[in-house]
Amino acid sequence: MAVEAKELKGTQKGAQKGAPKGEARCPGAPSTQEIIAADKVAAPKWVRSESYEFLGDEDISTDRYIEPSFAKDEFDKLWTRTWQFACREENIPQIGDYQVYDIGPYSFIITRVGPKDIRAYYNACLHRGTKLRASGSEGCASEFQCSFHGWSWNIDGTNKNVVCEWDFPHVDRKKLSLPQAKVEVLGGFVFINIDLDAPALADYLGREFKAHMDAWKLEDRYVYLHVAKSLPCNWKLAIEAFLEAYHVVRTHPQVAVSNGDANSQYDVYGEHVDRFISTLGVLSPHLYGKHTEQDILDQFTLGDSGALGDSSKPTLSQGGTARQVMADMFRGMFEKATNSDLSAVSDSELLDCFSYTIFPNFFVFPGISLPMIYRFRPDPRDHRKCLYEVLFMRPVPVDGKRPEPAEPIRLRDDQSFKEAAGMDLGFGAILDQDTDNLFLQQEGLEASAKHGLTLGNYQEVRVRHFEKAVEKYLAMDAKRPDIERLPSR
């Protein structure tokens, strides 16, 4: 006999009509924290915390998505002041290793100079400006030589050679070191900031998020799949498509069977970080009364099947829940795959979708079952396009030998994410669904007689939080690199 999906009795604060702005929650459904509290293995403090703040309910102007002048202001004011994920430490493990990172018109050679010394050099010859390394390139170098006239620099940034130095008596080679951006490393991620006056990365992120990230130990993971694709929309629209679970029931109906979408939790941390927690292995409140616990269990099979190494379909015992069966199964499979004891790892960490955004363009999904990274970068030549990257991560093997990080797979505009070698087909379908909406949204905003986006107070608070940060930086003066102040050693 089929067992109807179990519904926890919800005590959602503010679910009643007339609640203060931002306090209304999905009526008749348990909160995310109530679902997690019922789990067999308790969740840690960083999971059990809440940090919502009502940020207003006015429309968001559409100009920021469709006006070329807005994109120019972003390059002059926003991208020159914010911390950005440039590469992983594993991309440049040896001294001399480098990878080129571009953002808009700016380009940097991210280089390992010493075991604990990573630098970000402006990717331009100080003679007549030619790029020292091509965009998208990587490798290992003993010097950076210009392909035009042959001027060269050591990997520590000092000038190595000026061809026909006799013709440049006015040039002091001691002052000819490559200028640099600021660099910091956190969780194996290399961040850069063009602004020399920018706060330290820890201050930019805030103490609470820093504590969360320290708990994940992402430096002990490696990138096993890296997929990139150009999207036909403004970079902010692409980011905002992933900031809420409100779209799940319409855009991903196949997932709603096992996703607590309308009762997901949304948090904001300071100016630059926000989060949602979306519980999995539970039925969407939109579908209450329409599915059994076995239906939930049957659907909830998306994820990194390659890492799990087990394709068997689980079944539900009498009185059991899909969520608990999946937690037990995931725990056992990951213990076997990683030769580790996960008995103290909470059910929530094993199952649920945790999505953190670091402004302006970096997503971290630190869950055990499918840790991922998203990065979005605007196209410097067309504000209606952006580059979307998905990086999937796995634990470093128990023998400590770190595999080589995956080379990026660049999909054509007309290709499905499912065509990327190594992509889980179910998850690839979800990414296709997410991104297929974006061209229609970009065109719709340009055609609309309504010049604003209307947002929900709770479920879309991350969109508003993100756009408030955009507004903060665009209210500042343009900031361009000043070579007289740039550090060089």
PLM region spans:
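N-terminal pre-ligand scaffold of iron-sulfur
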Residues: A2-V3, E7, P20-G136, A181-V185
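C-terminal catalytic domain of Rieske-type non-heme iron oxygenases
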Residues: V3-K9, K13, K17, K21-G28, ...
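Short Pro/Gly-enriched beta-strand edge/turn motifs at strand-loop
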Residues: T80-P93, V162-D167, Y356-P360
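N-terminal short leaders/motifs
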Residues: K40-S69, R133-F148, S177-G187, Q299-A337
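Rieske [2Fe-2S] iron-sulfur-binding domain
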Residues: A2, I92-A215
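Short, flexible segments with low predicted structural confidence
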Residues: V41-E50, I155, E208-A211, D347-S348
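Short, solvent-exposed coil/turn linker segments
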Residues: S61-T62, C87-R88, D172, A200, ...
